[in-house]
Design a protein with these regions (language model features):
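Amphipathic alpha-helical binding modules
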Residues: 65-99
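Generic structural signal for short, flexible, solvent-exposed coil/loop and linker residues
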Residues: 3, 10, 52-55, 71
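Short terminal alpha-helical segments
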Residues: 1-38, 86, 90-96
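Amphipathic alpha-helical interaction modules
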Residues: 20-68
Length: 99
């Protein structure tokens, strides 16, 4: 069981959420390549989701780092740098610890 702001959650639920979050970040790659018209709105929605996660699990530094990487990627015009930021963000999800 994992402790959070309002009680506890099963570890399996946390692992599933980490996978969903990685998928939500990874999809930013094809969205950028395809010039998805709602890409900016998607970034905003993802940042709001991360902000909520941060509040629920004790404001961890790695979540702030993740948010910073994504904010940087949001404005990156060079695709190779954008891709690296997105892949770094996906990898960072595995490093987030839940108390």
């Amino acid at each position: 069981m994992i402790n959070y702001k309002y009680g506890t959650l099963p570890s399996s639920q946390i692992q599933k959420e980490k996978k969903r979050l990685q998928d939500a970040i990874f999809i930013l790659l094809p969205y950028k390549e395809d010039n998805y018209e709602f890409l900016d709105a998607y970034f905003i929605s993802l940042q709001q989701r991360l902000c909520g996660l941060n509040h629920l699990f004790g404001e961890q530094a790695k979540i702030l780092t993740l948010m910073s990487i994504l904010e940087s990627a949001r404005y990156e015009t060079e695709f190779s740098k954008y891709r690296k930021a997105i892949l770094d963000a996906c990898a960072l999800i595995d490093e987030i610890e839940f108390p």
